[in-house]
Design a protein with these regions (language model features):
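Structural signal for short hydrophobic segments within the conserved structured cores
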Residues: 1-2, 50-52, 81-86
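A short beta-strand-turn-helix
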Residues: 1-18, 60
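Short pre-active-site segment immediately N-terminal to redox-active cysteine/selenocysteine motifs
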Residues: 16-17, 23-27, 70
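Hydrophobic beta-strand anchors of alpha/beta hydrolase catalytic cores
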Residues: 20-21, 51, 74
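The canonical Cys-X-X-Cys-His
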Residues: 28-31, 74
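Typically the conserved alpha-helix immediately C-terminal to a functionally engaged Cys/Sec
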Residues: 32-45
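Structural microenvironment flanking redox-active thiols in thiol-disulfide oxidoreductases
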Residues: 56-63
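Non-catalytic, surface beta->alpha helical segment in thiol-disulfide oxidoreductase systems
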Residues: 75-100
Length: 100
């Protein structure tokens, strides 16, 4: 699901399950590599986590607010709190492990 400024904080703070937010850009090569991996994680953990993608070109203020300096950036939230930030290409297994 693509998120925009007005929704992201409400989604994060209201969620009872873990959230993974991916910050990406269409021109980002590693982001393109991660797209199918994120889809696999989403399918495997369906109903157990929420996964959102945020295009930094459409949402530059959020990229600044969340201190996104490299792409892709993955931020994991649990109980409304940021618990982990990952940058670059990630293994599916590592993401799944962190989200369980």
């Amino acid at each position: 699901m693509e998120l925009y400024d007005e929704k992201i904080e409400n989604e994060i703070f209201a969620s009872k399950i873990p959230i993974l937010v991916e910050f990406y850009a269409d021109w980002c090569g590693p982001c393109k590599v991660m797209k199918p991996i994120i889809e696999e994680v989403k399918k495997e953990l369906e109903g157990k986590v929420k996964i959102f993608v945020l295009n930094i070109e459409s949402n530059p203020k959020l990229a600044d607010k969340f201190t996104v300096l490299s792409l892709p950036t993955f931020v994991i939230y649990q109980n409304g709190k940021r618990v982990k930030t990952l940058v670059g290409i990630q293994k599916k297994e590592d993401l799944i492990s962190l989200l369980k």
